């Protein structure tokens, strides 16, 4: 399960069955949380049509920021600017990699471990999705876009008092991997007190 998991950046152009999404969420909500707070919110885009509207809105906003010279500095601005150009000139979706669905985890800022809980929940979702043949990718470009357009979180229904965890695009993979990635040995530090 762990060794076979791969990031998927190409998806089939169709929605997953709603029952499958429900099953993935139902299992994922059992992920461990600090002090058993169980306060992780899963914000989900369940339909490709909604993803298309979200992407169009974000690309429009990012293009406006780019035109006004207000994209973030450094690599973040470079990646976001490239996402705008790729969509406008080539129809290439770097923001969501063509995935029909998106999940964002968040938790109340006053929860005992809001960041850790959201990342554990999203990792659980990823592994359960992989076990069901669903492809996923941690969506850092979307997180950059969300930071550049913070009001979008509210439009997605994420409460103001929540700490954002991370986002993951997902859907039916349009690519099949026949072997795992060969990785080096684990980095281990053995403590000798």
What do these predicted regions represent?
Residues 1-29:
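Extended interfacial segments that mediate partner engagement and assembly in macromolecular machines
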Residues 27-29, 86-91, 151-155, 174-176:
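Glycine-rich, charged/polar anion/phosphate-binding loops
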Residues 34-37, 94-97, 156-161:
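Solvent-exposed alpha-helices and their adjacent loops that cap or buttress functional pockets
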Residues 39-40, 99-102, 164-165:
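Short, surface-exposed beta-edge/turn micro-motifs
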Residues 89, 158-193:
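C-terminal helix-cap and adjacent tail motif
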């Amino acid at each position: 399960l762990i060794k076979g998991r791969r990031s998927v950046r190409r998806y089939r152009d169709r929605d997953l069955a709603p029952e499958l999404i429900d099953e993935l969420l139902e299992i994922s909500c059992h992920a461990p949380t600090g002090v058993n707070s169980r306060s992780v919110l899963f914000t989900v885009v369940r339909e490709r049509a909604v993803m298309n509207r979200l992407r169009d809105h974000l690309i429009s906003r990012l293009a406006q920021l780019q035109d006004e010279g207000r994209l973030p500095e450094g690599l973040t601005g470079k990646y976001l600017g490239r996402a705008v150009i790729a969509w406008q000139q080539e129809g290439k979706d770097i923001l969501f990699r063509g995935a029909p669905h998106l999940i964002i985890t968040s938790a109340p800022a006053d929860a005992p471990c809001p960041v850790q809980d959201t990342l554990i929940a999203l990792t659980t979702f990823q592994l359960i999705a992989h076990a069901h043949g669903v492809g996923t990718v941690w969506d850092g470009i979307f997180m950059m876009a969300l930071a550049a357009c913070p009001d979008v979180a509210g439009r997605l229904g994420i409460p103001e008092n929540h700490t954002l965890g991370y986002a993951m695009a997902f859907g039916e993979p349009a690519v099949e991997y026949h072997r795992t990635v060969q990785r080096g040995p684990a980095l281990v530090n053995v403590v000798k007190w």
